[in-house]
Amino acid sequence: MPATLPPSIFNDVVGPVMRGPSSSHSAASVRIGRLARDLCGGTPESALVEFDTEGSLATTHESQGSDMGLFAGLLGWEADDERLPRSGEFLRAAGVAMAIRIATLHDPHPNTYRLTLRRGGKEHRLVALSTGGGMIEVVAIDGAAVTLYGDYTVTVLDVDGDGAATAATLRDRGDFDDVVVTGSSPVRVVVCAQRPLGDAEVAALPAVRRVRRMEPVLPVRSRRGLTVPFLHAGEMVQTADPTTRPLSEFALAYECARGGLDRDAVLAQMRKILAIVRAGVQQGLAGTEYRDRILPRQSHRFAALMEQGKLIDGGVLNRAIL
């Protein structure tokens, strides 16, 4: 998310919804994979992923979940899909020819994903960064520099000429959040909006020769001109006396404003997250088995050992862990 926008509770605070061990790896890579899938119009026939030897992913992409998340994203899965640990198997079953290349690329960011995908005789390239906490930034599409965060519906148009006429036509309509001209040979017009450009709209534009559409991957979209009731606790107490209503009501009002959502939509998303948390706790307490785990499961014995006084006395921390 750009620093100029106010944070979203679901995008930046309660989340990301993910399978461990690392949000910078597994959560971000699902989102990058989903955008790459959209870019090529569906599940790719082949995919090459490149990691820089000078970055952090060359030695951790498998153990920290980058591969798992990326494969799931290329299949169009959500981050909470139970099949995630087997995403590689499903990708192979889908007939995707997958390759990972480690090379010295001198990427300026340590968490850089370079993807080259092929589908229907066409090649697509995407470069994206994992910026922490599951957040991402797409910095290049098919060789053209962009700045995208997965919080808008994006339509990418390849156009003849300098793109000025196409961009001007779109800006004159006024119902798109951002229109940017980038790249050369061909020039690309990148449209960020609350919806994709329809086929009829594209046909009415001058000199468009190719179209790609990508849906947002963040839980809460951004939009032009959004405002929120407060940005920090000091501003919050100026809007109303916090002793007169639960703090949750302030959070609810904030996220409704940030996302352009109604109360029911925000509460439904929170209930979904709560259900995932509860299911994860129950699964953890029941214990899981993985062949590559160094230590066996521990959580299923935690309560009994705590009652027997056999744990290091962590006080309330032990209760919190349980």
Task: Report the location of each language-model feature.
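Generic N-terminal targeting/processing segments that precede catalytic cores or assembly contacts
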Residues: 2-123, 130-134, 144-145, 150-169, ...
